[in-house]
Structures are given as C-alpha cells and as structure tokens.
C-alpha cells in the first residue's frame, strides 16, 4: 500500500514538498493555481473528485478542520460515504455475516456517537474510497526515518477544475486570534442566564 498526499494552493510549488515528503509520502500531488487560495469549495472539490476517479484510492483521509468538514462531504458525492470526526483508525478484516462475505484490510473508522455515550466502529466494505475526517491532535505525528524519496507530480489545474468553479471569489478575510483554546482545555466553564448580570460573569473568569 502506498501513501499519497494532495496539496492545493497559490504559489506553493517548491515550498511545500520538503514539508510533506519527510512523513513517508510515496507520491505528492501539488496543485498550484491562482484561484486555489483563499479556499473556496468548488475548485478543491473538483480537484479531489477528478483525481480520485483517476487514481482510484482505497482510503481518503482529511483533517476534521473547518475546511475538512466542508470538503469531505462534498467529495463523498462519489457515493463513497464519509465518517466524520474520527478519533481512531485501524486496518482489519471484516465478516459480513448477513451477506455471507469476508473483506480483507478494511478501514475501521472509530468515533464517539450519541453525545459520546458510545463509541461507534464503522466500515465501508463496498464503496471506494473509504473516507474519514480525523480530529486534529488525536494521532501522533511520526516522521519517516529514511530518506524522503517520494515522487512529486504537478498536475495541470485546468484539467481538473473548470472555469465556472471560480465564480465565487473571496474579497476579504478577517481572522481573529482566539483568546482561549477550548479544543485543548481539559475543563470548560460556561455561564448562562442564571448568572444574573454582566458583573457576575466576571466571577467565572476567576475560576
């Protein structure tokens, strides 16, 4: 099994290769084009959909980020299905007792369900690619110990993205730095209407 990676953006050729290849990537696809940054849904969706039709990957993984949560469901229009916000992934065999079939090397997609009360393990035996988004930080990064020898491919963007995909343009971006990292917080304190007043909310900050 080979590991392929895809990166898309503007003026990234020659800048991203050495950041990605050391993680053991066998083939890196670099899509570099004027309309690929800032992110908009249509161009990036068509890049993945059309590339997947060519490459026929068994598994496709994305980060469960703001972009990943938008892009993943759109790409799963390939009728591949998608498991969102996975906290663990495993490879294993699966027996479908109802259908009487055995499957080798499926992706076990593990995620909390029903408000975190249970952990669900999901498999996609029939459709490809097996798609999942993974929550950032739940898996340890492992650098490839050998020399990075991955192949780098620079596809022609126009072959994958039609001109009408660029009809939506980002005119301005306003990014505010979060005051508190709620994702990494072990305990979150919140207040509601019962606090009574703005002054009483200040007491929560002391906690």
Residue spans for each PLM region:
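N-terminal glycine-rich FAD/FM-binding segment characteristic of electron-transfer flavoproteins
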Residues: 1-207
């Amino acid at each position: 099994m080979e590991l392929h990676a895809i990166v898309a953006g503007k003026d990234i050729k020659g800048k991203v290769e050495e950041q990605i290849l050391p993680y053991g990537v066998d083939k890196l696809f670099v899509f570099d084009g004027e309309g690929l940054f800032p992110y908009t849904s249509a161009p990036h969706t068509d890049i993945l959909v059309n590339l997947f039709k060519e490459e026929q990957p068994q598994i496709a993984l994305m980060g469960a980020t703001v972009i990943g949560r938008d892009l993943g469901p759109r790409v799963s229009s390939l009728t591949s299905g998608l498991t969102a916000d996975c906290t663990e992934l495993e490879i294993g065999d699966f027996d479908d007792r109802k259908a009487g079939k055995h499957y080798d090397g499926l992706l076990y997609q593990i995620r909390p369900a029903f408000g975190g009360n249970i952990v669900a393990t999901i498999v996609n035996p029939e459709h490809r690619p097996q798609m999942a988004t993974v929550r950032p930080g739940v898996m340890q990064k492992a650098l490839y110990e050998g020399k990075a020898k991955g192949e780098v491919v620079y596809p022609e963007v126009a072959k994958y993205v039609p001109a009408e995909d660029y009809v939506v343009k980002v005119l301005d971006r306003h990014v505010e730095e979060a005051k508190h990292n709620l994702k990494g917080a072990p305990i979150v304190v919140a207040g509601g209407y019962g606090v009574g007043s703005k002054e009483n909310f200040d007491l929560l900050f002391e906690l």
